[in-house]
């Protein structure tokens, strides 16, 4: 939830793209939907590398997904960055996506728009270069939590966080009976 309102920046030779993080999902080692659930492997070793690392993997053999590792070395916990509100580099995002709309409302779309590739797995998101997360203003809308989407195990856990009023992958009104609730420790806009 602390990543909501932060700015995700991608600097590539093509140009710079950025957006405000407006939707995330948490994954913990005891969670059956987490890639760390069965322990370390070659595929998920970055999850166990310590906080601030990018965990990038291929979903369904075609979508690159970006996670931020969020706990100490050896723990295996991350936050999937699901949606952004674009700030900078929108023309480049459109070229990469091959369309004018739906640039960053979904984890695969935002990775494509920002040029996030598998080579960034293990990249330190705290260094302020290449791909990084920077502080941003408090979110404009109310922060809510709901159950996660797109997982078959652990789907009942209310570990999806989003900013109401922003374009997210699946708007709360389309989530029937999935436990929409106010999040705790909501940061008030300045």
From Swiss-Prot:
Broad EC category: hydrolase
Keyword tags: DNA damage, DNA repair, Hydrolase
Domain of life: Bacteria
Enzyme Commission code(s) on record: 3.2.2.-
Any GO BP annotation: base-excision repair
CDD domains the record matches: AAG (cd00540)
A GO term, aspect molecular function: alkylbase DNA N-glycosylase activity
InterPro entries according to UniProt: Formyl_transferase-like_C_sf, MPG, MPG_sf
PANTHER family, per database record: DNA-3-METHYLADENINE GLYCOSYLASE
Family statement drawn from the similarity comment of this UniProt entry: Belongs to the DNA glycosylase MPG family.
Protein name per Swiss-Prot or TrEMBL: Putative 3-methyladenine DNA glycosylase
